[in-house]
Amino acid sequence: MKPAMSVEIGSLKLRNPVMTASGTFGYGEEFSQYVDLEKIGAFVTKGLSLKPRAGNPTPRIVETPGGMLNAIGLQNVGIDAFIQKKVPFLRSVNTPAIANFFGYTPDEYAELASRLDAIPEVAALEVNISCPNVKQGGIVFGTDPGCAASVVAACRAATQKTLIVKLSPNVTDIVEMAQACEGAGADALSVINTLTGMAIDLERRRPVLANVTGGLSGPAIKPVALRMVWQVARAVKVPVIGIGGIMSATDALEFILAGATAVQVGTASFVNPAAAQEIAEGMEQWLAERGIADISSLIGALEG
């Protein structure tokens, strides 16, 4: 008997718990020849802003032991080009597309949420709060509970769609951030975004990345991500989406046990473009082999 793999995130029903992570899967179309999109639960777009962004100068990606650093700088086509050039593809796919977006003031976030709310092909919104608040001296929204709550509340007022908030791990207390976002109206929380790191070229005595620091992702961050998912899932009532170093079905299932309702696959897609599909299939096979009837029975089932 095939196990039941479907899960719910807010009002969003997913055929299985595996999504792709923002910034690692383009706008979906780029990977559609490598992945059967109808074998994964959902895909998340590159982060969108009101205006197009060229991103940071190169080099902006570097491989590290157990992962990679990126300082892409949120390069994207902007909301207008997204609507004109990227949305038509979304109509052709029977898999939920989640739009990730960011701004530099609460008003910018709200405007983007409102515009994305009006697009039927966008199934849900994911808010990237790992951006500086230009109105408050550059403090990163995702490192201050009050700032984060103000962004989430502004977005909540602008959309009826499922609102997911992606949390930064670069904080003292992730539970405090999670509870602030839940209180402001988040329907779900993505845990975690990248950790801040850097790489140095010894011979040149210079940073490898032109931006100096970047976001660390991949297997190196998995233990931190698991711990944070476990902490957050026990402290909030909304679903948690686990992210961080998921390279296999086993990795994904560990996040489910820790309390995640769904997972996102990111860096693995750079290694193997079909990673998300293979992980989803591997999870189903693991349950079937053990006679587990429903994935939901594993959510938060960690013992001890």
From Swiss-Prot:
A biological process from GO: 'de novo' pyrimidine nucleobase biosynthetic process
Assigned keywords, A-Z: Cytoplasm, Flavoprotein, FMN, NAD, Oxidoreductase, Pyrimidine biosynthesis
Oxidoreductase as UniProt keyword: yes
Record-linked InterPro entries: Aldolase_TIM, DHO_dehydrogenase, DHOD_1B, Dihydroorotate_DH_1, Dihydroorotate_DH_1_2, Dihydroorotate_DH_cat, Dihydroorotate_DH_CS, Dihydroorotate_DH_I
Reactions performed catalytically: (S)-dihydroorotate + NAD(+) = orotate + NADH + H(+)
Binding positions (FMN): 22, 46-47, 100, 128, 166, 192, 218, 244-245, 266-267
Name of this protein: Dihydroorotate dehydrogenase B (NAD(+)), catalytic subunit
